[in-house]
Amino acid sequence: QKMKVFKIAIPIIIIISILSVDYYNKYYKDNTDFENESIYLYVIKDDSLGFTDSISKYFKSTKTFYKVAEKLGYLNNKKTGRFKIDKGVGNNEIVRSLKFNNTPVNVTFNNQERIENLASRVSKQILEDSLSLIKAFRNEDFLKENGLNDKNVLSIFIPNSYNVYWNTTSDDFRDKMLTEYNKFWNQVRSKKAENMGLSKLEVISLASIVQIESRKIDERPK
């Protein structure tokens, strides 16, 4: 009787072992294929072809990734964004990162002479294109609500580096820049501008002109 049970148990144990190894390999075995400690995947929700091209560069097996991603309900719920993937992780962790690890970018710009130049500079660093950004920057309701116009709106964009999500909208980016502008003008800076007989926008505008002219001088042939 014991021998009969043993003969039945052995194949079951073997099958369970094979299934366990297969499960581990699919979900937890390292599926990354890059040298750096981490990479960033730029995902656009409805761009399936672009997504496949991206993961094929960085994953050892796209086949197992897609199987796990489907099981975990990711493929029908892709999110647009910039996602950090660490080296040495399996498909389970990769999918988790693609769900929850949208990582900001550092958007940097210096003084620009025209709103079009600024939009072009920013559009190279986030998903939105320059036309969408220009439209948001020149939105009539936005300008009216904040006492701005088409000529002075450029002054609210203070040259610096800013943490924003790669998939931020043009309106959200513009509103963040206005918030940063208002933060910049604390009580001390506001008082200094007042003492000089200048408005906040005039101070920023003058500083921008000085920097641009200085840059032009530096760029002249020696």
Regions found by a protein language model. Name each.
Residues M3-K222:
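Conserved catalytic or metal-liganding residues and their short signature motifs at active sites
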